[in-house]
């Protein structure tokens, strides 16, 4: 099964993406912050990461 990690701070967007991706048979994991996303990516090794480039805790990493 394909694993997808969504890193997005807006719950409504995460919910929309999760619903669409799970309907296609994908396993979905979520993170609200960049820090949590990095931890989830290292732990779960997703096949695809959908990343919000405007996360508040990611401003200093650009």
Regions found by a protein language model. Name each.
Residues 56:
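The feature encodes the CheY-like receiver
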Residues 1:
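Phosphate-coordination loops involved in phosphoryl transfer and adenosine-cofactor binding
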Residues 8:
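Conserved acidic carboxylate
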Residues 52:
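Active-site residues of response regulator receiver
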Residues 5, 30-48:
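Acidic, metal-coordinating helix/loop segments flanking the phosphotransfer/catalytic sites
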Residues 11-29:
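Two-component/phosphorelay signaling modules centered on CheY-like receiver
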Residues 33, 59-62:
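Acidic catalytic/metal-coordinating carboxylates
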